[in-house]
Amino acid sequence: EGYEFGGVVGTHMTNLAFEEKCKMQSIPFARANVGDRYVSEELDRRKWLIGGENSGHILVKNLHSTGDGIISALQVLSYLVKNKKSLKNALTEIQLYPQILINIPTENKVNLKSKTVKNAIMESEIIMKGKGRILIRASGTQPLVRVMTEGPLRKEALTAAKFLTEKIKEII
């Protein structure tokens, strides 16, 4: 009750190209922590209808409150039918950026706000020529540090991810 389209909620792992596509179409975009629960909470906080995450879970608050795969598939099919599009054509509407994800196993808690990590991020932003996004986070479910880089230039994103990984391994 009281929800409106308003905008779209993704997660910290949602591809930057999707966020940019939303902005180009004047659709507000917000990021939540990874997980349906956090997407749902952000939707509730903003009173927005639509959110989702990379797993394919799509939440539409006026229809359902969970990221059910069958419901998500039916929603995609409904969109295709209403807009008279093939799945192939719909998928060409957005060109996602290459996204590099490296998982670093660790039994130790890593200070991701350390000067070493901050400097490595700054150097990685230079490697990526200021284009793209860098995310370093501890896994919520496994003993891992996740390093994610993405941007229009795959080579730079890969180089930056490898560089960050080496710097983090130095402080583990």
Model-derived features with residue positions:
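Phosphate-binding and adjacent anionic-ligand microenvironments
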Residues: 3-172
